[in-house]
Amino acid sequence: MAVQMEYEKDVKVPALDGKKIAVIGYGSQGHAHSQNLRDTGHDVIIGVRPGKSFDKAKEDGFDTYTVAEATKLADVIMILAPDEIQQELYEAEIAPNLEAGNAVGFAHGFNIHFEFIKVPADVDVFMCAPKGPGHLVRRTFEEGFGVPALYAVYQDATGNAKDIAMDWCKGIGAARVGLLETTYKEETEEDLFGEQAVLCGGLTALIETGFEVLTEAGYAPELAYFEVLHEMKLIVDLIYEGGFKKMRQSISNTAEFGDYVSGPRVITEQVKENMKAVLTDIQNGKFANDFVNDYKAGRPKLTAYREEAANLEIEKVGAELRKAMPFVGQNDDDAFKIYN
């Protein structure tokens, strides 16, 4: 079923007017939502644990409190802390301070959909999920545009949850460019699948495998890096701007012919079956439980995965090549730590 794009004109009720808003977390999404909402005239406070994010929020001019204090003061509470810490944060500091008629929001449905967080029946639960990272949500807002967003209602205790969700999306600039209504189930499962099978897991595995095939065949690692990784952005930018059609119109006939001939040899029916298995593990909660259990155990799996990835030859080759290419962007690993 096709969904209809909605815009600022479709946001009929200023549901956030007169409400005290608490943004919980001041990371990637937190800093963007809070600053954009403030700039659109809303009353925003920050709830965050002591540390760099707390200090940054105060530096940016926000009244900043502990999570518990911010929850007590607020009518609408948006939880933008990392997925893996939301459950303990909610149970320890948010749940004891909620009141009937409050609204609790999320930018991703993970903890609600998989029932790690259960909100009382007399509290609204909504979602505003921008389809872009926080720095882009903020930058495009400042440029007069925005990032499209999904919105959803999981629990409508007051009858106002949808209006709150849409007005939140408007407040961060998303309604300038388009909103799509969804459900917590749909957003959560599709988002995780996209990340794992295509955008992050699938893409990095494809690049690394291509690099291995070339280097194992005797080609220079530096040249292999350019062919399978460096040029990826050039192709993705074309697809982003105009779909497969623009990309194919922009490349050589040789490249286009090879696209049609060899793409299906790489992404076979077996790969599609593997993708379906990934989706099944998302749908049945296996991935969610594995992720949360690893976090509760001290992240042994995630730590091991990170160490293994850091030692890949393609990473070492790329690090050296990028030193000679300042035009590719920020090389400082600490650049966005305050917002992650």
UniProtKB/Swiss-Prot annotation:
Q: Name one GO biological process term.
A: isoleucine biosynthetic process
A single Pfam family, by name?
A: KARI_N
Q: GO cellular component terms?
A: cytosol
Assigned protein family: Belongs to the ketol-acid reductoisomerase family.
Record key words, sorted: Amino-acid biosynthesis, Branched-chain amino acid biosynthesis, Magnesium, Metal-binding, NADP, Oxidoreductase
GO MF terms listed in the record are: ketol-acid reductoisomerase activity; magnesium ion binding; NADP binding
Role of this protein: Involved in the biosynthesis of branched-chain amino acids (BCAA). Catalyzes an alkyl-migration followed by a ketol-acid reduction of (S)-2-acetolactate (S2AL) to yield (R)-2,3-dihydroxy-isovalerate. In the isomerase reaction, S2AL is rearranged via a Mg-dependent methyl migration to produce 3-hydroxy-3-methyl-2-ketobutyrate (HMKB). In the reductase reaction, this 2-ketoacid undergoes a metal-dependent reduction by NADPH to yield (R)-2,3-dihydroxy-isovalerate.
- What are the required cofactors? Mg(2+)
List the protein's name.
Ketol-acid reductoisomerase (NADP(+))
- Binding positions (Mg(2+) 1): D191, E195
Annotated organism of origin = Streptococcus thermophilus (strain ATCC BAA-250 / LMG 18311)
The UniProt entry, under InterPro entries, shows: 6-PGluconate_DH-like_C_sf, KARI, KARI_C, KARI_N, KARI_prok, NAD(P)-bd_dom_sf
The yes or no answer to whether the keyword NADP is present is yes
Q: Which reaction does it catalyse?
A: (2R)-2,3-dihydroxy-3-methylbutanoate + NADP(+) = (2S)-2-acetolactate + NADPH + H(+); (2R,3R)-2,3-dihydroxy-3-methylpentanoate + NADP(+) = (S)-2-ethyl-2-hydroxy-3-oxobutanoate + NADPH + H(+)
Q: Which residues bind substrate?
A: S252
- For the KARI N-terminal Rossmann domain, which residue ranges apply? 3-182
Q: What class of enzyme is it?
A: oxidoreductase
Positions of NADP(+) binding: Y26, G27, S28, Q29, R49, S53, D83, E84, I85, Q86, G134
The cofactor note reads:
Binds 2 magnesium ions per subunit.
Pathway per the UniProt entry? Amino-acid biosynthesis; L-isoleucine biosynthesis; L-isoleucine from 2-oxobutanoate: step 2/4; Amino-acid biosynthesis; L-valine biosynthesis; L-valine from pyruvate: step 2/4
